[in-house]
Swiss-Prot record:
Pfam families: Anticodon_1 (PF08264), tRNA-synt_1 (PF00133), tRNA-synt_1_2 (PF13603), tRNA-synt_1g (PF09334). A motif ('HIGH' region) lies at residues 41-51. A motif ('KMSKS' region) lies at residues 628-632. It catalyses: tRNA(Leu) + L-leucine + ATP = L-leucyl-tRNA(Leu) + AMP + diphosphate. Keywords: Aminoacyl-tRNA synthetase, ATP-binding, Cytoplasm, Ligase, Nucleotide-binding, Protein biosynthesis. This is Leucine--tRNA ligase. GO terms for biological process: leucyl-tRNA aminoacylation. It is found in: Cytoplasm. InterPro entries: aa-tRNA-synth_I_CS, aa-tRNA-synth_Ia, Leu-tRNA-ligase, Leu_tRNA-synth_edit, M/V/L/I-tRNA-synth_anticd-bd, Methionyl/Leucyl_tRNA_Synth, Rossmann-like_a/b/a_fold, tRNAsynth_Ia_anticodon-bd. Its EC number is 6.1.1.4.
C-alpha cells in the first residue's frame, strides 16, 4: 500500500492547476457568473490561521461554484498602505515601500501552498501607483460631483511627532510613540460627503437579506437616525441665544444646566477673553476626539457664569457650562442636561453638585436615584414632571407629544438628525495615496489634471534616503516633490502633502478586481459583467466602517459612471466568520525582569504526568482557556509549520470541520492530528478499492449507492448554506460506510470517486489524486458536481416501533408498502411481544402505516 505523501501530492496538483490556468477568470456570457471575495489582507509578512480559515471558506465556495457550471471570479490582493510600514521604517531605518513589497512576496509564497483557487493574474496592492493613480482619478471625479470638500476639523495633534494621530494612537492623553501630551487642534481637512447618503444607506439595509442581521443592526445604529427637538435658550444678558438639539425633549422639565462644547463659538469667544477659560479648554483638548474616547474620559466642566432662561418658564434660569464630553460636530454643539435620565449628565452633575430632577420613573414607582434612570423609548413610564401628554405613556409617545407641543406653541421645531458624520480622509502620513490637488497662490485649491496621474510618492529626497525617524510628514519637508506648476495657470504652486485614509483604498478594490489593468478606475463592461460581489467573506470587526464606506463608494462611483446602477449595493451576500483560537501557556514559576507574565509558544510546551511543562526547562505551565491567537500571548500556530508537517489539506479540513464557520474554532494539536489521520484513511481506502478486481462482485450495491446519494444531497446542502462542519460530518459518515461496504468493485469505485468530488472543495489536492488514481477524466477541479438521484433518496423500507400497552417493546423493519395484515403478523411474532402476551391473543392491534404498531394485551 502506498503512503500518503501530502507535500508531493500538493505540489504536483498546484503545478497542474497553474499550467492549465483553470482559475484565470474570463468573461463568458454562456455561463452564470459568480464573484466570491474574501476581505484582502494587510501584508504583515506573516500568514496566520485566521487567514487560513477565511481564505479556505472562500475557496470552498469558489470551487463548488466552478463545479456547478459557474464562471467564477476569485481574486486576491493586498491592502498595503498604512502606518505599520512607516513604523517599521522608523525602527529599522528602511523604507516603507521595500518593507511592504517584501512582505507581499512573502505572503504570496505562504498562500500558494494552501492550494487556493485564486486568479493570481489579477493581483494588485493598493500601494501600486497603477492602483492609487486610479484612486486619485476617483477623488477628482468625486470632487467634480461635489462629493468631496474641505473644512476645519478638530484632530489629535502630537506636538513632538508633528502629526495627526488616530484616536487609537492616543494612550492616556499621550501620543503612543512620542509620549507627548496630545492636543486637540483645528486643521483644514478633506471630507467625503457620506452624510448626504445617511437616509439612503439606512433604508437600503432592509434589502440586504443575505447579510447577517447583527451587521445590519450595527450599521443602523452607526448611521443613527433620530427624531428630536431643536430649540433655543434665551440668554439673560440679551446676547445671541444658545440653540440646542435633543432626542429626549420629554425630559425638559428636568433640565439642570446647559452644556456647550469646548469648540462652541461661545466657548471660543470666552477662551479669547479669559486665560482661565483658555487653560480649561486646553485641558479639554487633551485626549481622543471620538465619542468613545470622550465617553470614557473623566467629565470636566467650567461654569461660564452665563445664564439662560428655560423655554417653559422665563423665571427658571439655568447655568451654562463648558463640558468636555460634548461634541461640536453632533447636533448644535450644545445640549440641555437632564442628569436624572442621562448617565453622562448624572456623573457631571454629581461631580459639580448640580440639581438632579427626576421627570419620569418606572410605573411601579422609584426609590432614590443612585444612577440615571434611562428607560428605552419603547417602555411605558410614569411622568412625574411631564409637560406633554398623559402621565403614563412610552418615552416615544412622550417625545412626539413634546415635539408637537413645541411646534404648536412656536418655541421649537421637530428635526430628524443622523449620527453619521462626514468622512475625514486627510492623513499627515507619507505611506498613503497622495491627495491630487495643488495649492496655488493665485488660483487657490486646484484639482490636478488626470493626464498627470498618478501623483506618485517620492522614493527618496532627490537621491538622499528619506529619514523616517524625523518627526512629521516627510512629504512636507521634501526638497522638490512638493513644488509643482499650477494645473490652471502654470505658475509655481505646491502639492497637497496630506495622504488619504487607508479606508479609502479598501472601499473600491472589489470593483477594481473586475478589470485590474484598466486605464480608468473600472472598465464599465467588465463591471457590468462581474459586479456585484456574490459572496463577500470577512471578520465582524469590519461590520461598520469598511462595509459602510464601501457602500458609499459604490454609490459615488455609480454617480460618476464607473459602476452600473445595479452595483450601488456592492455585496449581495456577506458572511462573517469566527476567529481561530488557542490555549495560552503562561509560565507558572517565574516572571520576566519587569514582573510581567511569560507566555510560551505551543511548540515550546508538552503534556506529561497529568500537566503541561516547558520542554527545555521543565517549568510548570498554567494553561489559560482558549483565546484569539495573539502575538503578545504567543498562542499562535504557524500555518507553514502545519503544512510542512501534515499538508495544506489537513489544515483546511480541520479549520472547516471543528465548528460552525460563524463561530470561533479552537486550534488543537490533537484536532490537527485527527484530521490528518482521517485523510490518511481516505487515501488508504482509495488504495484498497484501486487494488480490487474490477469484475469482483459483492453485496449491498444498492445500499451503498443509496448512502452515496444521501451524501451528495447533504454535502451540497451544507456547502450552499455555509454549513461546512455539517458537510464534513456527513463525509466522515460516508467514509465509514464505504470502508465497511462489501459492494462490488464497480460500485465502490463509483463511490470513492464521488467521495473525492464531495471532498474536493475542502481538500482539493487529495481529491485530485484520488480522482486520477480512479481514472477520472481531466481535473476534478473542472469536473461537474455530482447530482443526487431523487429516486435513490426514497427509502424502500421503514423501521416501526412496537408498543405493548403503551410501553415500547421492540421494533421491526419492513417493506414500505407491506400490507397491514402482514405488518401485524410480524409484530406479533416479535420475541419481546410474545413474552408479554404469554401465548394469549391480543385484544387489539393498531397499525399506523410508516409510524408505529400498538398492541393492546
Amino acid at each position: 500500500m502506498s503512503r500518503y505523501e501530502a507535500s508531493d501530492i500538493e505540489a504536483r496538483w498546484q503545478k497542474a492547476w497553474e499550467e492549465a490556468a483553470i482559475f484565470q477568470a474570463k468573461e463568458d456570457h454562456s455561463k452564470p457568473k459568480y464573484y466570491v471575495l474574501e476581505m484582502f489582507p494587510y501584508p504583515s509578512g506573516k500568514l496566520h490561521m485566521g487567514h487560513v480559515r477565511n481564505y479556505t471558506m472562500g475557496d470552498v465556495i469558489a470551487r463548488y461554484k466552478l463545479s456547478t457550471g459557474h464562471n467564477v471570479l476569485h481574486p486576491m490582493g493586498f491592502d498595503a498602505f498604512g502606518m505599520p510600514a512607516e513604523n517599521a521604517a522608523m525602527a529599522s531605518g528602511g523604507h516603507p515601500k521595500d518593507w511592504t513589497y517584501s512582505n507581499i512576496d512573502t505572503m504570496v509564497e505562504q498562500m500558494k501552498p494552501l492550494g487556493l483557487s485564486l486568479d493570481w493574474s489579477r493581483m494588485f496592492a493598493t500601494c501600486d501607483p497603477e492602483y492609487y493613480g486610479q484612486q486619485q482619478a476617483l477623488f477628482l471625479d468625486f470632487l467634480e460631483k461635489g462629493l468631496v470638500y474641505r473644512k476645519n476639523a478638530v484632530v489629535n495633534w502630537d506636538p513632538v511627532d508633528m502629526t495627526v494621530l488616530a484616536n487609537e494612537q492616543v494612550e492616556n492623553g499621550r501620543g503612543w510613540r512620542s509620549g507627548a501630551l496630545v492636543e486637540r487642534r483645528e486643521l483644514t481637512q478633506w471630507f467625503f460627503k457620506i452624510s448626504d447618503y445617511s437616509d439612503e444607506l439606512l433604508e437600503a439595509l432592509d434589502g440586504l437579506e443575505n447579510w447577517p442581521a447583527k451587521v445590519r443592526l450595527m450599521q443602523e445604529n452607526w448611521i443613527g437616525k433620530s427624531r428630536g427637538l431643536q430649540f433655543s435658550f434665551e440668554r439673560t444678558d440679551g446676547e445671541e441665544a444658545i440653540e440646542v438639539y435633543t432626542t429626549r425633549p420629554d425630559t425638559l422639565m428636568g433640565a439642570s444646566f446647559v452644556g456647550i462644547s469646548p469648540d462652541h463659538p461661545i466657548a471660543k469667544k470666552l477662551e479669547a477673553e479669559s486665560q482661565e477659560v483658555a487653560d480649561f479648554v486646553a485641558e479639554c483638548r487633551k485626549g481622543g476626539t471620538t465619542e468613545e474616547a470622550i465617553e470614557t474620559a473623566e467629565k470636566l466642566g467650567y461654569d461660564t457664569g452665563l445664564r439662560v432662561k428655560h423655554p417653559l418658564d422665563p423665571n427658571w434660569e439655568l447655568p451654562v457650562w463648558i463640558a468636555n464630553f460634548i461634541l461640536m460636530d453632533y447636533g448644535t454643539g450644545a445640549i440641555f442636561a437632564c442628569p436624572a435620565h442621562d448617565q453622562r449628565d448624572f456623573e457631571f452633575a454629581t461631580k459639580y453638585n448640580l440639581p438632579i430632577i427626576p421627570v419620569l420613573e418606572p410605573v411601579e414607582g422609584a426609590g432614590e436615584l443612585t444612577e440615571a434612570y434611562v428607560p428605552t423609548k419603547a417602555e411605558k413610564v410614569r411622568y412625574v414632571r411631564g409637560f406633554a401628554g398623559d402621565e403614563l405613556q412610552t418615552g416615544e409617545e412622550g417625545v412626539n407629544t413634546a415635539v408637537d407641543k413645541a411646534e404648536a406653541e412656536g418655541w421649537g421645531q421637530g428635526v430628524t438628525k443622523f449620527r453619521l458624520r462626514d468622512w475625514g480622509l486627510s492623513r499627515q502620513r507619507y505611506w498613503g495615496c497622495p491627495i491630487p490637488v495643488v495649492h496655488c497662490p493665485d488660483c487657490g485649491v486646484v484639482p490636478e489634471k488626470k493626464e498627470n496621474l498618478p501623483i506618485a510618492l517620492p522614493y527618496d529626497e532627490d537621491g538622499k534616503a528619506i529619514d523616517f525617524s524625523v518627526p512629521g510628514n516627510p512629504l512636507d519637508r521634501h526638497p522638490s516633490w512638493r513644488n509643482c506648476a499650477c494645473p490652471n495657470c502654470g505658475k509655481p504652486a505646491q502639492r497637497e502633502t496630506d495622504t488619504m485614509d487607508t479606508f479609502v483604498d479598501s472601499s473600491w478594490y472589489f470593483a477594481r478586481f473586475t478589470a485590474p489593468r484598466a486605464e480608468t478606475p473600472t472598465d464599465l463592461d467588465a463591471a457590468n459583467y462581474w459586479m456585484n460581489v456574490d459572496q463577500y467573506i470577512g471578520g465582524i470587526e469590519h461590520a461598520i466602517l469598511h462595509l459602510l464606506y464601501s457602500r458609499f463608494f459604490a454609490r459615488a462611483m455609480q454617480i460618476c459612471g464607473h459602476l452600473p446602477e445595479s452595483a450601488k449595493e456592492p455585496f449581495d451576500a456577506l458572511f462573517t466568520q469566527g476567529m481561530v483560537t488557542h490555549a495560552i501557556y503562561e509560565n507558572a514559576e517565574r516572571k520576566d525582569d519587569n514582573g510581567r507574565a511569560i507566555y510560551h509558544y505551543p511548540s515550546e510546551v508538552e503534556e506529561r504526568d497529568g500537566g503541561v511543562f516547558v520542554k527545555e526547562t521543565g517549568e510548570r505551565i498554567k494553561v489559560i482557556p482558549s483565546a484569539k491567537m495573539s502575538k503578545s500571548k504567543n498562542n499562535v500556530v504557524d500555518p507553514l509549520a502545519i503544512i510542512s508537517t501534515y499538508g495544506a489539506d489537513t489544515a483546511r479540513w480541520f479549520v472547516l470541520s471543528d465548528s460552525p464557520p460563524e463561530r470561533d474554532v479552537e486550534w488543537t494539536a490533537s484536532g490537527a492530528e485527527a484530521a490528518y489521520k482521517h485523510l490518511n484513511r481516505v487515501w488508504n481506502l482509495c488504495d484498497r478499492i484501486g487494488e480490487m478486481d474490477p469484475d469482483a462482485k459483492g453485496e449491498g450495491d444498492e445500499e451503498l449507492l443509496r448512502e452515496m446519494h444521501k451524501a451528495i444531497r447533504d454535502v451540497t446542502l451544507g456547502v450552499e448554506s455555509f454549513g461546512f462542519n455539517a458537510a464534513i460530518a456527513k463525509l466522515y459518515g460516508f467514509t465509514n460506510t464505504l470502508s465497511k461496504s462489501k459492494a462490488s468493485a464497480a460500485v465502490q469505485k463509483q463511490a470513492i470517486k464521488t467521495l473525492a468530488q464531495l471532498m474536493s472543495p475542502m481538500t482539493p489536492h487529495l481529491a485530485e489524486d484520488i480522482w486520477a488514481h480512479q481514472g477520472g477524466e481531466g481535473l476534478i477541479a473542472n469536473a461537474a458536481w455530482p447530482v443526487a438521484d431523487e429516486s435513490m433518496l426514497v427509502e424502500d423500507s421503514v423501521t416501526l416501533p412496537i408498543q405493548v400497552n403503551g410501553k415500547r417493546r421492540g421494533e421491526i423493519t419492513v417493506a414500505k408498502d407491506l400490507d397491514k395484515a402482514e405488518v401485524e403478523k410480524l409484530a406479533l411474532a416479535h420475541e419481546a411481544v410474545q413474552r408479554v402476551l404469554e401465548g394469549a391473543a391480543p385484544k387489539k392491534v393498531i397499525v399506523v402505516p410508516g409510524r408505529i404498531v400498538n398492541v393492546v394485551a
